[in-house]
Amino acid sequence: EFGVSADYILGLTEKKENENKGNVHIDYNPQNKEVVRIPMLLMSSSFQLGKCLEFIESIEDVPQKEMAYAEYYYFSGQHEKAVKYSEMYLNHEDIMLKLSASLIYTFANLSLDRINSARIGLNRLREYLEKAMSMEIDKKTRACCVFVASAAHTLLHLPVGNIPPLSEYLNEFTKGMQLWGAYVLAHKTYLNKEYERSLGIVQACIMTSDKIYPIAFIYLNLVAAMDCMNMMEKEKAKEYFMKAWEISKPDDLIEGIGEHHGLLQGLIETCMKKEHPDDYARIIDITYKFSAGWRRIHNPDTNEDVADNLTTTEFTIAMLANRGWTNKEIAEHLDITTRTVKQHLTCVFSKLNITNRKQLKDFMLR
């Protein structure tokens, strides 16, 4: 069990803003001169599609604005700029800015293959979580530490310390942060192979949101596509993937698509390679960069051996074969011949030094 109330999953939980007047409300209001910051503001915000930069410019608090730019540069695949903006706030006195900075700094440096720098950011997140759980601090600050640590843990599939259940803190979050929290829960449920349940979380959150939260919605639709692929519902998977693409395209927020390549099991290829060749090439470039850096941390830290010597096409075919797809099903899904599938699998087996499909599981994503 998630420990999440039915009201939350159905989007009925609202923050009781008139209660606990002594506690600070952590929403952001551009008209409010007394700004109280939250981590990952852009990721958790609602804004009009195609107006991301205008939204960032409307933020009056300069540090929060600069961190929002760091988020934008990261989610649009501009990793050097993301590092430049985020590293300015790694040692800031405001914990909310430090949390955002450490998360962006970690992920952006992975894609730049700066593993030592990525480890610095990851270690900062572990330190903040440990302090948050051991010190007497307000619940909202602790909740935000858990929020960021959970995001890093889920997206990287790496240990980030002893993280308490995110569900215990959901009511402390703004609506956008709750949606991101739902993505984390759905992703964890996906990893537990409870695909229908994971999809249900996504559907409930999207249906009950009266605004669009672009970055959160991109990631929610991606995990829904992953769920559908594992239930062999290919057409529905394509619909969710294309929804993620439609949301990401106006502001060029393509990083998340590239990061999820392996888990999307060929959807990027089938939906984008012919129709959007230039965007496809950029997304695959993100995939290669992120995957290479991620494996350099993930494999030694988890004692797992996710394959690092396969092309994106080979990895996709290997993932599908590992999930039980026949050569014919793989060929139809990727619009290639069964002979081509067999040729790719022969290359995969040779590179991984294995002899059959059953051995693939040791080298694939979960």
At which residue positions do the language-model features occur?
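DNA major-groove recognition helix of helix-turn-helix/homeodomain DNA-binding modules
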Residues: E1-Y8
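Short, charged recognition helix plus adjacent turn
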Residues: G11-Q31
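Helix-turn-helix repeat elements of alpha-solenoid scaffolds
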Residues: V35-L53, E71-E87, S111-Y128, A151-S167, ...
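Solenoid-like repeat scaffolds
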Residues: L53-V62, E87-K98, N123-K139, P164-Q178, ...
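TPR/TPR-like alpha-solenoid signature
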Residues: M67, S102-Y105, V146-F147, A182-V184, ...
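Linker/hinge segments immediately adjacent to helix-turn-helix/homeobox DNA-binding domains
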Residues: A151, G161, M177-F217, N221-T312, ...
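Helix-turn-helix DNA-binding segment
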Residues: R295-T346, S350-T355, K361-R366
